[in-house]
C-alpha cells in the first residue's frame, strides 16, 4: 500500500492509503488483522482529477460499504495532505454520490446526503 496512514474521524478509526488496484475481501481482512490498532475500516483514495477523489471504503470484515460520513472526512483530509487535489475544496466520490468537502487545517466540513426514509431502500 502506498502512503498508508492511520486516521481517526470523530470516533471511527481507519487505515487510509492511495488506491493502487482492487483488493479481494481476504486481502482487506488481512490488512485489518495486521493493524497494530483496532480499526473500523480501510479506505483507498483514488485521484479522479485535480478536484475529485474516489473513496473505496471497506468495513473491517472486508465488505464494501456505500458510505461512512467519518470516512468521507478522512478521505478529504488524506487527499489534501497527499496533494491528490489542487486545493482544500474538493469532491469525494462515494457509491451514494458526490459529496462536497472543505478542509481547513485540522477541520473537515462536508455536505452529507439526506437519510433515506423509504422502506424500499432499506
State the predicted function of each range.
Residues 120-122:
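Conserved small/polar residues in nucleotide/adenosyl-binding loops
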Amino acid at each position: 500500500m502506498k502512503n498508508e496512514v492511520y486516521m481517526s474521524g470523530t470516533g471511527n478509526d481507519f487505515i487510509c492509503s492511495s488506491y493502487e488496484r482492487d483488493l479481494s475481501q481476504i486481502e482487506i481482512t488481512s490488512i485489518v488483522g495486521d493493524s497494530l490498532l483496532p480499526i473500523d475500516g480501510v479506505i483507498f483514495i483514488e485521484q479522479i482529477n485535480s478536484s475529485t477523489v474516489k473513496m473505496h471504503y471497506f468495513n473491517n470484515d472486508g465488505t464494501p460499504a456505500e458510505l461512512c460520513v467519518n470516512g468521507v472526512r478522512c478521505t478529504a483530509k488524506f487527499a489534501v495532505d497527499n496533494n491528490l487535489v489542487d486545493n482544500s475544496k474538493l469532491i469525494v466520490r462515494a457509491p451514494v454520490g458526490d459529496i462536497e468537502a472543505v478542509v481547513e487545517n485540522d477541520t473537515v466540513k462536508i455536505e452529507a446526503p439526506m437519510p433515506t426514509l423509504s422502506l424500499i431502500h432499506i
